[in-house]
């Protein structure tokens, strides 16, 4: 099937614009996607090459440099008054000529604006001034970008084969000249471990949660039909880290008809600050052992099988099976489900991040169905939200 014509894409843009004005969910994401599609339909190969190999790499490098000299913070602090090249060059420690050349590219790429020799921050650049985004930029430029750059030489050298899961011989190792796994490297490079954690936090920032209105129908699928005589536990967050997701769930649906239980490794649970106001219980659990909480209404996992190979993913899911009450308990997986027909960039981005750094992958719907079937479960439904890479897979006993 041929690509959409510019005229048809413009019609889609107009429709998405009306939805955006009405504050409809997914409209912003649709506008971005259609805008990119319009550019792709209009660009000629020479423009594509310049954009891909000149404009974007230069932008990445300048944005990374900006984190070292606090450029976005200075522009944010200047607010509507802005700052001229001389003032910004002085603040950032650059010579005026160099600053002006770099800043002009930021203007050309719509990151900042300029008028009558004065530079101004934008909503985008002001957002990038936040520390979590500054650290995310450092991780993406210093760690991920070289790993992607190693793709051509690495895959040519290995005969174009997928690296083994958890590899110590992949694009990341090739780019950074190391022979240890990506997680081991992070532990040995504490600043980048912090940058990586900030990146993961920023990756999810501002995106709808699985339990938000319009995503997964919590009231219909969990709250309605809850039976305390079967179990007084409403939700178990398996491998839930320090409790971000389960705390969000509790705050959105308080008062709750049943208990909330967070499970993770001992060192993670012990790192959670004491808080008498929290609505969940925190307990230790190894996901490779049988689930100890029986007959809860739902068992929730957010990106838990995600980092494991298929065999381990099957074991993790199978360990839930003895705890489930047939026809009552639900298994909820908050995971990326890669659409094979119409993949979205947020999903393919993360899939390639996994390939570059760990030899892992994001799974398709067929992949998830296969894993759950092998574990003794069946998919009831897959819920998605417009513009969000992660879906909510609901499963139950087969």
From Swiss-Prot:
S-adenosyl-L-methionine binds at residue 264. Changing residue 265 to A: Impairs enzymatic activity towards FDHMP-3C, with only 35.6% activity retained, and R265A only exhibited a 0.39-fold decreased activity towards 6-O-desmethylmycophenolate. One of its GO terms (molecular function) is polyketide synthase activity. It catalyses: (4E,8E)-10-(4,6-dihydroxy-7-methyl-3-oxo-1,3-dihydro-2-benzofuran-5-yl)-4,8-dimethyldeca-4,8-dienoate + S-adenosyl-L-methionine = (4E,8E)-10-(4-hydroxy-6-methoxy-7-methyl-3-oxo-1,3-dihydro-2-benzofuran-5-yl)-4,8-dimethyldeca-4,8-dienoate + S-adenosyl-L-homocysteine + H(+); 4-farnesyl-3,5-dihydroxy-6-methylphthalide + S-adenosyl-L-methionine = 4-farnesyl-3,5-dihydroxy-6-methoxylphthalide + S-adenosyl-L-homocysteine + H(+); 6-O-desmethylmycophenolate + S-adenosyl-L-methionine = mycophenolate + S-adenosyl-L-homocysteine + H(+). Changing residue 362 to A: Leads to a significant decrease in methylation activity. The active site is at residues 306, 335, 362. PROSITE patterns: N6_MTASE, SAM_OMT_II. InterPro entries: COMT-like, O_MeTrfase_dom, SAM-dependent_MTases_sf, WH-like_DNA-bd_sf, WH_DNA-bd_sf. Its main location: cytoplasm. 6-O-desmethylmycophenolate binds at residues 144, 199, 265, 303. The keyword Cytoplasm applies. Its EC number is 2.1.1.-. The keyword DNA-binding does not apply. One of its GO terms (cellular component) is cytosol. (4E,8E)-10-(4,6-dihydroxy-7-methyl-3-oxo-1,3-dihydro-2-benzofuran-5-yl)-4,8-dimethyldeca-4,8-dienoate binds at residues 144, 199, 265, 267, 303. S-adenosyl-L-homocysteine binds at residues 197, 203, 237, 239, 244-245, 264-265, 286-287, 302. 4-farnesyl-3,5-dihydroxy-6-methylphthalide binds at residues 144, 199, 303. It is found in: Cytoplasm, Cytosol. Keywords: Cytoplasm, Methyltransferase, S-adenosyl-L-methionine, Transferase. Belongs to the class I-like SAM-binding methyltransferase superfamily. Cation-independent O-methyltransferase family. Homodimer. O-methyltransferase; part of the gene cluster that mediates the biosynthesis of mycophenolic acid (MPA), the first isolated antibiotic natural product in the world obtained from a culture of Penicillium brevicompactum in 1893. MpaG' catalyzes the 5-O-methylation of three precursors in MPA biosynthesis including demethylmycophenolic acid (DMMPA), 4-farnesyl-3,5-dihydroxy-6-methylphthalide (FDHMP), and an intermediate containing three fewer carbon atoms compared to FDHMP (FDHMP-3C) with different catalytic efficiencies. This is O-methyltransferase mpaG'. It comes from Penicillium brevicompactum.
